[in-house]
């Protein structure tokens, strides 16, 4: 059986942390930032952890 291929789109979007959780960037942070207030843009630029209900599927996609 051939080797499993990782999902390249998921590999670009998610990273595995040292503790084993999956980290992701928040959405709405690439353009039109002048319309959003400073508090919102500051929160957008912080990364967050993936929800535990989706963690198993994403780990399978990135082969972690």
Curated annotation (Swiss-Prot):
Keyword Ribosomal protein recorded: yes
GO cellular component: cytosolic large ribosomal subunit
Pfam families in UniProt: Ribosomal_L35p (PF01632)
Keyword set includes Ribonucleoprotein: yes
Coiled-coil features, chain-numbered ranges: none
Alphabetical list of Gene3D superfamilies matching this protein: 4.10.410.60
Keywords: Ribonucleoprotein, Ribosomal protein
Record GO terms (molecular function): structural constituent of ribosome
UniProt xrefs under InterPro entries: Ribosomal_bL35, Ribosomal_bL35-like, Ribosomal_bL35_CS, Ribosomal_bL35_sf
Gene Ontology biological process terms, A to Z: translation
SUPFAM superfamilies referenced in this protein's UniProt entry, alphabetically: L35p-like
Composition skew (Basic and acidic residues), residue ranges: 25-35
Annotated segments matching region Disordered: 20-42
Record NCBIfam families: rpmI_bact
Record-given protein name: Large ribosomal subunit protein bL35
Source organism: Chlorobium phaeobacteroides (strain BS1)
Designated gene of the protein: rpmI
């Amino acid at each position: 059986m051939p080797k499993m291929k990782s999902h390249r789109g998921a590999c670009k979007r998610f990273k595995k942390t040292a503790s084993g959780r999956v980290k992701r960037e928040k959405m709405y942070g690439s353009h039109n930032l002048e319309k959003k207030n400073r508090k919102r843009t500051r929160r957008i630029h912080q990364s967050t952890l993936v929800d535990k209900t989706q963690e198993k599927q994403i780990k399978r996609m990135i082969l972690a």
